[in-house]
Amino acid sequence: WFADERCVAPEDEESNYRLAAEALLDRAPIDAACVHRMRGELGPEQGALSYAGELAGHVQGGGDAGVPVLDVIVLGIGPDGHVASLFPGAQTLSAGAGAICLGVEDSPKPPPQRITLSLAVLRAARACILLATGPSKADAVAGMLGEPTPHVPASLLLRERLTAIVDDAAAPAGPLR
């Protein structure tokens, strides 16, 4: 399962699926039936509807939001504190509690059209691993550890289920909580 995708063809250089395929999926003995890519080529709305249906059909729902509950989700964090394609202050952060997958029309990072899992799905995961490397992520990691705010979407993840793996350059100064 993927957390987000750019609305491009799967073979496009901007495709998260292509990146994952080249770095991992094509190199490991993974059954293709176990890989569920977001269909960015369908566009934001149709791609989100398609993926929401596929995810809901394969993964049991639960929790307060009634959304599919993934065992583990692995996310990166952007320099602005975004996770998946949930950007600071974006409307997608306030999607209804039962939302599974959302179309994004106006990403501040190119390309502007994307598909993303909702915050409800990210928060419902049994465990979340967040990766951050490099000095450009230090402010975002520090913001993630502060008070929850839609200005730093990563701060909205459930901390009791979150494991952050950061290198020295991305680690904020002082003790971590």
Positions of the model-derived regions?
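Class I SAM-dependent methyltransferase SAM-binding "motif I" and its flanking Rossmann-like core
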Residues: 72-120
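Structural motif
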Residues: 34-36, 71-73, 99-100, 127-130, ...
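Short glycine-rich anion-binding loops that position phosphate/pyrophosphate groups of nucleotides
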Residues: 6, 77-82, 135-136, 170
